[in-house]
Amino acid sequence: MVDAHTHLDACGAKDPDSVRAMVDRAEAAGVTRVVTVADDITSARWAAQAATWDERVFAAVAVHPTRTVKFAGAARHALKELAREPRVVAIGETGLDYYWDYSPKDVQQAAFRWHIELSKQVGKPLMIHDRDAHDDVLSILDEEGAPEKVIFHCFSGDAEMAARCIDAGYFLSFAGPVTFRNALSLQEAARIVPERQLLVETDAPFLTPQPYRGRPNEPYCLAYTVRYLAELRGVSVSELASAVNATAERVFGLGHSEQS
């Protein structure tokens, strides 16, 4: 399987040895590849470098919406260069976050539009962070013209929101919160996503799935979310694992793997 969104640096990885050890733990649990995701320029540089240390690691680069206040000039130039690196497979995470008050909405929206254009320029998927901003995210995608591949990372909407995304051809990635007992509307959404548009992720070190909610998360924990989703959707674990692996390979252009 592919962990479609994780943060190896935030999990504690610092160098080739620690990256290898973390991905070894993941592979022992059936997670054969990971996409480590940036939230600022420093982590974007690290992610792009980490993806050269281990063939199982790929990178996504962007500036997180809560960190967009100082996103201009040199930072944008650096991100454009990183986005073209061959081991960088997505532009993310970008989008809108109206929960935290770290960056004004208009600043976030301008940065989001810029990332959308970058995604189209380099021909790589757009990986979206959407927190309490569903309508504005969808509106801006419509206004700007969505890239060919759009991923809603750690999807947090209900079934109605999911249906809108599905109709638009977007990919929905589910993380640990779908396993939480009170996440009924999210679980309803997860039931209706076609396999060809379904991804799974850890968003580690955050949002550890049940039964280990509240403890540190790592890519190896993806298996708990996959097992839960399989039960929720009424399919076998192997069937779901195969489906989400195929979707991830197609979205990120990873090529076929003999392992799931």
Stretches with model-predicted labels:
Residues 1-260:
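Mid-domain alpha/beta scaffold segments of enzyme catalytic cores
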